[in-house]
């Protein structure tokens, strides 16, 4: 039985990973919050990855670290962003060395590439981070590979993770809620922006595959199909038998962005293919809005 530490375990992705891995592994979860908020039964330790002394006191040895902890913000001048996503990465790498960790799985962000210029998007797509947040995620990739060695690090570049715990102000829960309540959709531009959504349960499955294969390297972890905003709205309307209408207004500065993602490398080296359809995920999210 492997001993696996998950940072940011209370988050959207971290909690899904813990839920899947619990049955076959000893899971230790850590997050900044005082209490375990996942509803799952595992050893939970409150810890802040920016505090190296506290981090070094976590259990040792550890077989695998799944690093989910991160600050997500559009504030390019946020000190917390740098402290968590950069200094926190260095501290986590130091702990990994001291804990004799065999492999570290880092959840990165596919949008570090900036505007997609080559589709489908592969792992060799040029990198052009559009914000400081995305710069910190790319820093995380490079720093971990440098500090631990490329053969010990698995990087997952993820597009748009979704699940039942997705924040209610995000586009997918908003669309689902609108459809259920027969509220009209207001979409910027012509709704042509194409996005890739992946269920957090599939991300957890990808983590499990990487652990089993004892892999290393950079992998796009995405679903098989991408959808425009217009297609997503139409899908919600049809799925929930809604009378909602679609209205178009304003400008979408990313109207021509196409997040069409190649997962060939993950299929070939990890044996991973996304299982959950967008319809299944939308139905799962809808449970938040149905009495």
Which functions belong to the PLM regions below?
Residues 50, 80-91, 127, 131, ...:
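Glycine-rich NAD(P)-binding loop of the Rossmann-fold in SDR/ketoreductase-type enzymes
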Residues 115, 128-154, 180:
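Active-site Tyr-X1-5-Lys
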Residues 113-114, 128-131, 154-171:
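Flexible, glycine-rich beta-alpha linker
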Residues 65, 76-104:
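NAD(P)-cofactor binding segment of oxidoreductase domains
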Residues 91-132:
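Conserved Rossmann-fold NAD(P)-dependent oxidoreductase catalytic core, especially the SDR/UDP-sugar
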Residues 179, 183-291:
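C-terminal substrate-binding subdomain of Rossmann-fold SDR/epimerase-dehydratase oxidoreductases
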Residues 49-84:
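NAD(P)H-binding glycine-rich loop region in Rossmannoid oxidoreductase-like domains
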Residues 4-23:
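N-terminal Rossmann NAD(P)H-binding glycine-rich loop of SDR-like oxidoreductase domains
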């Amino acid at each position: 039985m492997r001993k696996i530490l998950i940072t940011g375990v209370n988050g959207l992705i971290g909690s899904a990973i813990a839920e899947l891995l619990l049955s076959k592994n000893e899971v230790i979860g850590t997050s900044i919050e005082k209490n375990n908020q996942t509803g799952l039964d595992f050893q939970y330790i409150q810890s802040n990855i920016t505090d190296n002394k506290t981090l070094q006191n976590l259990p040792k040895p550890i077989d695998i670290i799944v690093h989910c902890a991160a600050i997500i913000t559009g504030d390019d001048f946020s000190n917390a962003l740098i402290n968590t996503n950069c200094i926190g990465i260095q501290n986590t790498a130091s702990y990994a060395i001291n804990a004799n960790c065999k492999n570290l799985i880092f959840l990165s962000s596919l949008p570090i590439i900036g505007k997609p210029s080559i589709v489908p998007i592969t792992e060799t797509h040029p990198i052009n981070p559009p914000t400081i947040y995305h710069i910190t995620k790319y820093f995380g990739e490079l720093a971990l590979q440098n500090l631990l060695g490329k053969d010990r690090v698995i990087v997952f570049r993820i597009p748009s993770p979704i699940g039942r715990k997705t924040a209610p102000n995000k586009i997918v829960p908003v669309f689902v809620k609108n459809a259920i309540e027969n509220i009209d959709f207001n979409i910027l531009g012509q709704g042509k922006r194409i996005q890739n959504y992946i269920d957090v349960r599939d991300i957890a499955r990808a983590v499990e595959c990487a652990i089993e294969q004892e892999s290393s390297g950079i992998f796009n972890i995405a679903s098989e199909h991408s959808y425009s905003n217009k297609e997503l709205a139409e899908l919600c309307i049809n799925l929930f038998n809604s009378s909602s209408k679609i209205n178009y207004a304003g400008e979408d500065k990313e109207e021509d962005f196409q997040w069409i993602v190649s997962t060939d490398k993950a299929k070939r080296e990890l044996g991973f293919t996304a299982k959950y359809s967008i319809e299944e995920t939308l139905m799962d999210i809808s449970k938040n809005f149905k009495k």
